[in-house]
């Protein structure tokens, strides 16, 4: 344990010192680092994909489910998206040093706010090798140093990607310890990292309930997190039929193992006949297992009667729960009870009810006539995301550059003294 603690202490000290140097880093230097990383990944994609295949083979042998394997898998399309995200983040405005709300007060002083970095961010993640790059890019651009701890299932992929990061940071003239990777897979390292409040300013976990529970029980460092992605799509009585079918199908089937996939479909009883038969047929053709309320079960003998547990389950699989409701109020009541406050969407052509839905539904993202799969930092123009927060403090929704900063007050005077 002492050796693990010593390792985390060393990484923490290095990261804290690196964070101090990042405060004065120019936007050009930070952007150059991101562009360098993109180029390194492009040049080394063969070795990255080879490392990823090794991780996939090991994970299949260990019996990882399809959802986790999908998160783990890299291909040329996903690598292209990583590179695209890096370039997009490089092109975003640098939030650090931005001064807002500068106003004269009655005393004659000017008071405003300046945006500053948080300091040192610890990112603990499972199954997603792309997080290695997303997290580094967002932290560097927002002036934060980062300590990465990936899961054992992605150890080869993470190492291949981190090699690209390490070379690129030093080439840009930044402190090499701006981004560090914990090499040991000993789980004690996670516990020590989340307790390292002398060095780490925030922890961002990306993983399952087991990981989040372990972190929450041990952490002395603030956590930016979401527990589940129990997302809902509600088809209103004034929904456009084709929009409803297209949105509901995409929201479930685009990717099953992601937190923005719809897990429960709510349908107004007045549009069941013109929407659900076609939608059910499409789901079944795609291989989606359907579970429904008693009214839904009557529509097809292939639909399994849903249990109380289904409404509060994040499947991360080709499974969907369907419930028929008599009103929007009933739909909102269901969402209030079972939602994880991640993302909800209404399909409706009625302006008043759509506004009511986005006002009354208290999730981190609420949508009108759009698939829940859009709940993503890249799609929101953030250049990517380091995670999605369902908490109400300090940031909510996809966490991009601004979410990795805070504001401090600045006061400008000209010899002012307080009487």
Curated annotation (Swiss-Prot):
Organism: Vesicomyosocius okutanii subsp. Calyptogena okutanii (strain HA)
Catalytic activity line of the entry: L-glutamate 5-semialdehyde + phosphate + NADP(+) = L-glutamyl 5-phosphate + NADPH + H(+)
Main location (coarse class): cytoplasm
SUPFAM superfamilies in the record: ALDH-like (SSF53720)
Top enzyme category: oxidoreductase
Signal peptide region: none
Protein name: Gamma-glutamyl phosphate reductase
Location(s), subcellular: Cytoplasm
GO molecular function, one term: NADP binding
InterPro entries recorded: Ald_DH/histidinol_DH, Ald_DH_C, Ald_DH_N, Aldehyde_DH_dom, G-glutamylP_reductase_CS, Glu-5-SA_DH, GPR_dom
Record carries keyword Oxidoreductase: yes
């Amino acid at each position: 344990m002492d050796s693990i603690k010593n390792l985390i202490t060393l990484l923490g000290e290095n990261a804290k010192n690196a964070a101090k140097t990042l405060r004065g880093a120019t936007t050009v230097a930070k952007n150059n680092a991101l562009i360098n990383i993109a180029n390194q990944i492009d040049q080394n994609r063969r070795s990255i994909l080879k490392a990823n295949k090794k991780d996939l083979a090991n994970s299949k042998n260990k019996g990882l489910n399809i959802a986790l394997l999908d998160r783990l898998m890299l291909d040329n399309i996903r690598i292209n998206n990583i590179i695209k995200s890096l370039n997009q983040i490089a092109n975003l405005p640098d939030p650090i040093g931005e001064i807002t709300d500068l106003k004269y007060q009655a005393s004659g002083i000017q008071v405003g706010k300046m945006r500053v970095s948080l300091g040192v961010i610890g990112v603990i993640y499972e199954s997603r090798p792309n997080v290695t790059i997303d997290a580094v890019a967002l932290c560097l651009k927002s002036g934060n140093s980062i300590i990465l701890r990936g899961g054992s299932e992605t150890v080869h992929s993470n190492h291949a990607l981190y090699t690209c990061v390490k070379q690129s940071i030093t080439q840009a003239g930044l402190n090499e310890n701006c981004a560090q990777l914990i090499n040991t897979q000993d789980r004690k390292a996670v516990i020590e990292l989340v307790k390292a409040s002398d060095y780490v300013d925030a922890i961002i976990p990306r993983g399952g309930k087991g990981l989040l529970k372990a972190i929450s029980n041990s952490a002395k460092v603030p956590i930016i997190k979401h527990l589940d992605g129990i997302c809902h799509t509600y088809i209103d009585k004034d929904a456009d039929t084709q929009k409803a079918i297209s949105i509901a199908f995409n929201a479930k089937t685009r990717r099953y193992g992601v937190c923005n996939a719809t897990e429960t479909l709510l349908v107004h009883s007045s549009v069941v006949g013109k929407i659900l038969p076609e939608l059910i047929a499409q789901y079944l053709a795609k291989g989606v297992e359907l579970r429904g309320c008693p009214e839904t079960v009557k529509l097809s003998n292939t639909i399994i009667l849903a249990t109380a547990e289904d409404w509060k389950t994040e499947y991360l699989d080709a499974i969907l729960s369907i419930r028929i409701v008599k009103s929007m109020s009933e739909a909102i009541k269901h969402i209030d009870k079972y939602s994880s406050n991640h993302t909800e969407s209404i399909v409706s052509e009625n302006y008043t009810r759509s506004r009511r839905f986005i006002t009354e539904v208290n999730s981190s993202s609420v949508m009108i006539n759009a698939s829940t799969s859009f709940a993503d930092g890249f799609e929101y123009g953030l250049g990517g995301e380091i995670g999605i927060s369902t908490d109400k403090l300090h940031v909510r929704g996809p966490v991009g550059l601004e979410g990795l900063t805070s504001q401090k007050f600045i006061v400008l005077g000209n010899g002012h003294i307080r009487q």
